Regions:
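Concave beta-strand-loop units of leucine-rich repeat
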Residues: 32, 51-58, 74-81, 96-103, ...
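Leucine-rich repeat
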Residues: 44-49, 66-72, 88-94, 111-117, ...
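C-terminal capping region of solenoid repeat domains
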Residues: 2-3, 15-17, 189, 198-203, ...
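Intrinsic disorder/low-complexity signal
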Residues: 15, 24-25, 36, 71-76, ...
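Residue-identity detector for glycine
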Residues: 1, 6, 43, 56, ...
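Canonical leucine-rich repeat
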Residues: 59-62, 66, 82-83, 88, ...
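LRR N-terminal entry segment and analogous cap-like coil->beta motifs
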Residues: 5-83, 91-101
Length: 313
């Protein structure tokens, strides 16, 4: 404590600390909107933690454009230039590309080993083993539609977003530690052991196949069916571990008694679902119930469990 206060009382050191603190606050986010020279010759570029590049120009010489110390790089919708090994410094943990970025095939070393978050909107090339660093925890590839081989995606991934993926999933394609997953417009067959037992939250939208028992792992606690699908909900197709359940927005057909597991505490019915509630449809564990916008049926006695404390109409 004495050392700290002796330094703090030194007017020169105090002034220097305040100056650097001001530089950091003023330059922690740098937006490049004219040329890359804005970044190369920025007088306080070393203070930047977030860099947003809004232009379509090459990054330039090997590793010279983006300063070491930056932790987040965002390439917006205009950027569409090659990324080479060493261009992104090893301090970067979060990397995002806009919808116009159509990269070449990546090679080992393209991304730094510090990376934990990668979002590539339009990437649609084959991914080979070790091309993505083993540090990635969140991977979002929105327009990706190339077949994935088992054990290619890093085992470190805990959140995976695969939208528009239309190839048959195989065992071990989805990494074993994934806890949150978005699978949008997947239209191939599901089967047992395709999703890992680590999975807790699943967003499964526009799945146009039947859903059967054991297709989804019993580790799932939050299940959202998005816009549409499955074609039918077979008996026990929703895992008995699910606590938060949202049926697909476009679902209109009658939900049979027994389809909602006893574990569900938070239930959202589809906007256009307008069937009378049958006794026994809603589980006794339910505490929160959200009806769809167009629901206008008379609620009969004993259809809503006494455990429900919140109702949204």
């Amino acid at each position: 404590d004495k050392l700290f206060f002796s330094i703090w009382r030194n007017m020169y050191l105090f002034s220097e600390i305040q100056k650097h603190h001001r530089f950091y606050n003023e330059n922690k986010k740098i937006v490049i909107c004219r040329t890359m020279d804005q970044l190369r010759y920025h007088p306080h570029r070393r203070y930047a933690s977030t860099i947003i590049i809004q232009i379509n120009q090459p990054l330039g010489s090997h590793g010279q454009a983006i300063p070491y110390g930056a932790t987040e790089i965002e390439f917006t919708d205009r950027f569409n230039q090659p990324i080479n090994a060493g261009d992104i410094p090893n301090s970067v943990t979060k990397l995002s590309f806009g919808p116009h970025y159509t990269p070449q095939e990546f090679s080992i070393g393209t991304f730094p080993n510090s990376l934990t978050y990668l979002d590539i909107y339009t990437f649609n090339k084959l991914i080979s083993s070790n091309e993505l660093p083993s540090t990635i925890e969140t991977l979002k590839i929105t327009a990706f539609n190339q077949p994935l081989k088992p054990n290619v995606l890093p085992s470190s991934i805990t959140k995976l977003c695969l939208n528009n993926y239309k190839h048959q999933l195989e065992p071990q394609v989805i990494p074993p530690k994934v806890q949150t997953m978005e699978l949008n417009s997947y239209n191939c067959e599901f089967g047992e052991n395709l999703l890992p037992n680590s999975l807790q939250c699943l967003y499964l939208s526009r799945f146009k196949k039947n859903l059967y028992e054991n297709y989804l792992p019993s580790s799932i606690t939050d299940l959202d069916f998005g816009d549409d699908g499955p074609l039918t909900f077979e008996t026990k197709s929703i895992p008995p571990s699910v606590k938060i359940l949202r049926f697909p927005s476009l679902h209109r057909t009658l939900l049979p008694v027994g389809i909602i597991p006893d574990s569900v505490v938070d239930l959202t019915l589809p906007p256009h679902y307008n069937h009378p509630l049958q006794i026994g449809l809603l589980p006794k564990s339910l505490t929160k119930l959200s009806f769809g916008y167009y629901y206008n049926r008379l609620l009969k006695p004993n259809t809503i469990p006494q455990s429900v404390t919140q109702i949204k109409l």
